[in-house]
């Protein structure tokens, strides 16, 4: 299990949430007041960590949502070829291949150490811009 639960009212901008089983960073939260026929609702707008897709959901404020547990790790770049990067984890020495993001392609060189995030069975290189 790489997620935990939290109520909608506990969420804040900048934190993470699972929407359609995709980890997303919250960019906007608006809470409505309780009305005559229902409880307060929270509207969450978030952007996918791995696909940069904008997602929006509406839940009652007492609704439990899934929060992904994101592991932040470091890896050494072994090689860069054909839009793929071969990495070796700095702690476990496990080697794995990730697709190369065109935005960071010119910044990644063999031998350098890069941070990457791992959650829900997915990994992504997270270089600082």
UniProtKB/Swiss-Prot annotation:
Highest taxon of the lineage: Archaea
Known CDD domains for this protein? Answer: S1_aIF5A
List the keywords (alphabetical).
Answer: Cytoplasm, Hypusine, Initiation factor, Protein biosynthesis
Disulfide cysteine pairs (residue numbers) = none
Q: Which InterPro entries match?
A: IF5A-like, IF5A-like_N, NA-bd_OB-fold, Rib_uL2_dom2, Trans_elong_IF5A_hypusine_site, Transl_elong_IF5A_arc, Transl_elong_IF5A_C, Translation_prot_SH3-like_sf
Q: Which Pfam families match?
A: eIF-5a (PF01287), IF5A-like_N (PF21485)
GO MF annotations in UniProt:
ribosome binding; RNA binding; translation elongation factor activity; translation initiation factor activity
Q: Which GO terms describe its cellular component?
A: cytoplasm
Q: What's the protein name?
A: Translation initiation factor 5A
């Amino acid at each position: 299990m790489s997620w935990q639960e939290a109520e909608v009212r506990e969420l804040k901008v900048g934190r993470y949430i699972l929407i359609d089983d995709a980890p997303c960073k919250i960019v906007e939260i608006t809470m409505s007041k309780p009305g005559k026929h229902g409880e307060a609702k929270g509207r969450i707008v978030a952007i996918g960590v791995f696909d940069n897709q904008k997602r929006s959901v509406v839940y009652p404020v007492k609704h439990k949502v899934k929060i992904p547990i994101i592991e932040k790790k470091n890896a050494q770049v072994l090689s860069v070829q054909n839009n793929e990067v071969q990495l070796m984890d700095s702690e476990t020495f496990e080697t794995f291949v990730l697709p190369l993001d065109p935005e960071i392609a010119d910044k990644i060189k063999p031998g350098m150490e890069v941070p990457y995030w791992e959650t829900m069975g997915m990994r992504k290189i997270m270089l600082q811009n």
